[in-house]
């Protein structure tokens, strides 16, 4: 799966009334009506012992300059990194992220050693205009503008 490019997010949640987070790249849109998204979480994570049906979680879509936050919330904790949480929407989100999504859990499905958290979007906001942080083949990458060799015309369909 390392040859599939993904965006990088930090999923934020409340644990014992305090802001907490974990890095996740298994985040996706599920439905437009209703607006549903999903995140895949390892069963042994603190998230799964804290967040259940009806609870909220936040998805912070990281900018390419936020590798340090990805590493921090991915388990390589930095004692010197200040986590820039804010709660303008009564929920902890990360300053400097490309976008923020707040989600209410509507379903949880077991999938091997993970749980799939499906949630209805309750809030979306744009954050910092910046290129996204992406991950490919075990490394962070930067997106470059690509000039396609073939032009796609919407009238042609798929």
Regions found by a protein language model. Give the residues of each.
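Basic, polyanion-binding surface patches
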Residues: 1-158
